[in-house]
Amino acid sequence: MNTLPLISVFSKPWPSHSAANLSDVLLSLGFKGIELPIREGFQVTPDTIEKALPKFASELRQNGLGVFSIAGDVDEVTIRACGESGIPILRTMLKLDSTISYQENVDTFRRQCEELYPAIQDSGVSIGLQNHCDGFACSSLSVIHAIEPLRSDCVSAVLDLGHTGLEGEREDLAIDIAWPRLSMINLKNAIRFPDGTDAAGAVKWNRTWVSGKE
């Protein structure tokens, strides 16, 4: 029995490739699957997802490339399209509305997920909540806190190690915290670096994406 983890790549850099061309490129790089962004300007958009996602996913599989997850809207249409396409994870993030409290943002997300339980269970899909930086739920702890009372067969944790780096979170601790509900890890690397000072003399910090060894 093969217990090696599945390794996919976010297909964001190839928004206009056909299924055949995208498969050729990524299979040549050694990948067996992708995470597909559902966005305007890409192969599948929020408006076309019902018909376009099953079709595009089927074409990719015919060319030897799987779709392991999508990044898209959390709604019933998207969930059912994932189910029809055989895609197990719908990745999302919790963007914080600054006009309400953090807990109110979390409660809104939880209610949204609970209302979608029937569609999630019918479709065999998991909503994967990912950490992000800045104005989002930004740590492994915030992700686990948000999803903790939700059904584990319906909502899971996705950990992005680039954003743990930007937030100054230790990667090993972040993985340990998220592990009980973890469905996917995003492997990328980012750092903050000093970039001059402001008028008050405080250091300004910028960010950059770097190779894994840095």
What are these regions (language model features)?
Residues 9, 36, 70, 92, ...:
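Conserved beta-strand positions
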Residues 13, 99, 103, 208-212:
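The substrate-binding groove and active-site-proximal loops of carbohydrate-active enzymes
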Residues 20-24, 59-62, 66-157, 166:
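Active-site acidic/histidine proton-transfer and metal-coordination neighborhood
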Residues 35-57, 61, 100-101:
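Glycine-rich, proline-tolerant flexible connector loops at the mouths of alpha/beta enzymes
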Residues 118-214:
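Acidic/histidine-rich catalytic cores of soluble enzymes
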